[in-house]
Amino acid sequence: MHMRLFSKFKLHGSSAASEEVFGGKFSYTSAVADFYIELGDAHKIWKPRDVVTGEVVLTLRKPLRGVSLRMSLEGNLRVQTGSGATSRLKFQRTLFSKSSMIYGVEQPEDAEQEGHGLTRGDHRFPFRMRVPSKNIYTSIAFEKGSISYAVGCVLETRSGAQRLSSCSRQISVLVPVDVSLLPKLRPKTVVLQSPQLLRSAKANYPEHDTASSLTKRTTASANSNSSVTTVCSSKTVTISVDLPESGYVIGDTIRIKVHIQHYKEYRNSAGLIATLVRICRVHSTGTDDPMETFRKDICQCVAPLYVEPETHTCSVGMNLNVPLDAFPTLVVPNQGFTFQYYIEVLANLSSKNIVYTESNRVIGGSGMADIPMPGSKLHPVKKISMLPLKLQGPLGKQDTNIDESLIFFQDMVNVDKLKRLRNVTGTSIEVVIGTHRNNSVQQARQSCPGSPVGGSDSTMMSEQSAAGTSLPSSVLDIYDQLANRLSSSVGDQLLRYGMSPDSGPHSANDELPRYTPNVDYMVTEDKRELEQRKLKELESEPSVEEEQ
């Protein structure tokens, strides 16, 4: 009985926080009317080492004693498993957590003292917290996980034994990625040989020889195994893909140069397909949990493939755009997830393979327009199907750069189905998507002759550019070259069939050639048009003079 009276006496003589902890009649829940965080710049995207400023707003209906406010900045990594209603938390990790007291003390020196108190009304507490520079990644949220950062504040008792109320505010963090420091990529080459020739070539070797030794012997001197080298190199297709840079900024145009060395003349209206791909990999947490991989095709470019009958070579320039809504390359180690970008180039080396889009629309079919190919007396003029201009998309008033034509972001070619077909080969090159490019660093690297830009190995692309034969920079340049460069005007997309095959290229200042009908093409008038023309010639009403 005495113990109970003593406890009630201590409770009455203590602070309101003690009454709440031990079940007093005053409640902190009813005392707090509003509790939130106001950021100095609510729409700012923060970077490492930036200082987040703002105010904590606390509105009380009644005074409180013995309380403190603790500010925190925390980053969390969450990985989900499953999809939809079956989604559940698979893994969670705290990237960093830092806190500081903005009102009150950590631990009071005397447990009997009442500590800090707050009166009734509005209270504003300014704060400043610096974003760390280590173990931090760009904010992201998707179906399989998220990386989030939040500024929070906790109203607690003076000893920190109980959290009375809390509030938080999400912030967006962007980790800058400078692509000017990345080295230049070397061209990637793919060699395609006939399976029958490989089987016949392997029969001439001992059983212990492998495919790698076969490749080495085919590139050896002509004195050893000359017969096998001749057979394997006679029907070999070499595809070389070259990228000018290994890193690109959001909004950049990726210029791809493709060089093909064929063993015969070949043409295909949808022979080359370049795709900007984003691969997401969700790492496993154990042996029983496999790694998940997801693919997203961002944009695509389709170009015609025409192998010259004399040289059996083809050089094509293709363009891809990094969209403005893309996010930088993200790699989170230690059971996290990664987002990496790749340039995938496919070569369709069979005219029998039909290229379909996601909506089952055929590209390069019989409904395409034809453009003439350069010919000679020995090689007659042939035709190749040209992709329709509607694939280029509607051009705006300021979109006068035709280098971005034939780049589409919707209704793309189903690359997975196309790769399963025969005589379809290709390669993929990883690129880094960054946030900015330091132009001064890039210019210094280009001006320095000893900088390792392209390595010591010279490629077919560099040899051709050094010899003076500049490669085309866009798909439309290929069309102009195939049509004997009828006009170099950017806006002249209509081909004029009446020009002679040996006419030279025209400059921008030259007058446009006049149209002359070509006798090689049979032109027949439509029957309906003839009837409409006859009806127009007939007089619908008698003239006034005849009536008089």
UniProtKB/Swiss-Prot annotation:
Pfam families in alphabetical order: Arrestin_C (PF02752), Arrestin_N (PF00339)
- Cite the InterPro entries for this sequence: Arrestin-like_C, Arrestin-like_N, Arrestin_C-like, Arrestin_domain-protein, Ig_E-set
Look up the domain of life of the source. Answer: Eukaryota
Query: Which SUPFAM superfamilies does this one have?
Result: E set domains
Coiled-coil intervals: none
Which residues lie within the region annotated Disordered? Answer: 439-470, 497-516
Gene3D superfamilies attached to this UniProt entry: 2.60.40.640
An example Gene Ontology CC term for this record? plasma membrane
Q: Which terms under GO biological process does the entry name?
A: cellular response to amino acid stimulus; ubiquitin-dependent endocytosis
Q: Where is the composition biased (Polar residues)?
A: 439-449, 456-470
Q: What does the record give under GO molecular function?
A: protein-macromolecule adaptor activity; ubiquitin protein ligase binding
The role this protein plays is:
Required for the proteolytic cleavage of the transcription factor RIM101 in response to alkaline ambient pH.
Q: Which family does it belong to?
A: Belongs to the arrestin family. PalF/RIM8 subfamily.
> Which protein are we looking at?
pH-response regulator protein palF/RIM8
